[in-house]
A protein has these predicted regions:
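Phosphate-group recognition and catalysis centered on beta-loop-alpha active-site segments
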Residues: 1-339
Length: 339
């Protein structure tokens, strides 16, 4: 590789990926219920580069956008289908999922950000998220798609390719990025869509980077997940590099490592964006898109460490941090969007 091409901006340019990339994690999910129309419309109108989503499949074979394996955290499934409150998404038909309220939980969890109009928001299909991404000619975000628990959904990689192809989303380079924690799914995604950029997500624990402590959170007996992960590190340098090599061998153009958040909390994990790690990625021709940071102090630290893009629940904050042109206020936008 020539000397100039192993820096992040050059790698990103070669893949037609914005640099640094603003990846709206489940939409603008700090200000609106994750993975709903409100969150994705808000992220689009703020100017995010990508709408990030998690893909699963219904009992009747429709691709839907849900993060958790079960529906209890982000819907009223316990009231609607009490005997199936802990059933996986794949046990429900699309009609059943559409009958759930995927917004009211947010109003209860975050009263300071609650809006009456969030009640009764629905779970979305992949088609509906594509419609949102295409809905404003002035704001055209790409899609950053994770295949969730791919073992549970055999053939989801081909199904995704067929859908993206049918919607004309495989024609423009860099418009779609595919992401997975699963090396087998990475290989299958690469087989189906060799030309589409792919990211291997990294964390420390089961089925990923082996921890120096030899412990997984589940076996640690600890209560606080964030502080447990904040202390975890790869078994050694070589273990981390092995995963970079696996990403490269599987067809990835980058990795998606976790990070520690300065305020810890639910989405804080191990620090896998130390400068030497990012440098090792760049030396292998891999971009680094870190998940999931929401505060300026963490944005600054990550950029200083050499990352090429950030997954964030606060796309507006990150866009302002990058001083992108005129980022409107979230509250005003939500109002204009009818929320």
């Amino acid at each position: 590789m020539n000397a100039g091409a192993s820096d992040g901006p050059s790698l990103a340019k070669a893949q037609h990926v914005p640099h640094p990339a603003v990846i709206a994690h489940r939409g603008a999910s700090f200000d609106a219920p994750e993975s709903t129309t409100a969150a994705y419309l808000l992220a689009r109108e703020l100017g995010a580069d990508y709408l990030e989503l998690d893909l699963q499949r219904t009992l009747d074979n429709v691709l839907v956008v849900v993060h958790d394996d079960v529906l209890a955290r982000t819907s009223d499934v316990a009231e609607r289908f009490p005997e199936r409150a802990k059933s996986p998404v794949s046990d429900f038909t699309l009609a059943e999922l559409k009958s759930l309220d995927a917004g009211s939980w947010f109003n209860k969890a975050y009263p300071d950000r609650a809006r009456e109009s969030f009640a009764k928001l629905q779970i979305l299909t992949l088609d509906e998220v594509i419609d949102i991404a295409e809905g404003n000619p002035q704001r055209q975000p790409g899609l950053y798609i994770e295949t969730k628990v791919p073992k549970q959904f055999p053939g989801i990689e081909k199904q995704l390719k067929d859908k993206l192809q049918a919607r004309g989303w495989l024609d423009k380079p860099g418009r779609v990025i595919l992401q997975t924690f699963d090396r087998n799914s990475l290989a299958l995604l690469h087989q189906q869509m060799p030309q589409v950029p792919k990211i291997l997500l990294l964390w420390i624990g089961k089925d990923s980077i082996e921890p120096k402590s030899g412990k997984d959170f589940a076996d640690s007996g600890e209560k606080d997940k964030a502080s447990f992960y904040a202390r975890q590190e790869p078994k050694d340098h070589d273990e981390f590099l092995r995963w970079l090599d696996a990403a490269k061998a599987g067809g990835a153009i980058g990795t998606g490592p976790s990070a520690v958040r300065s305020k810890l909390g639910e989405q804080s994990y191990a620090d896998l964006i130390q400068p030497w790690m990012n440098q090792a990625s760049h030396e292998r021709g891999l971009l680094v898109h870190v998940y999931t940071l929401d505060d300026r102090v963490d944005f600054a630290k990550a950029m200083k460490a050499g990352v090429d893009g950030i997954f964030t629940n606060r796309a507006g904050e990150l866009l302002r941090f990058y001083a992108r042109s005129q980022v409107p206020a979230e509250a005003r936008l939500l109002k204009e969007l009818g929320y």
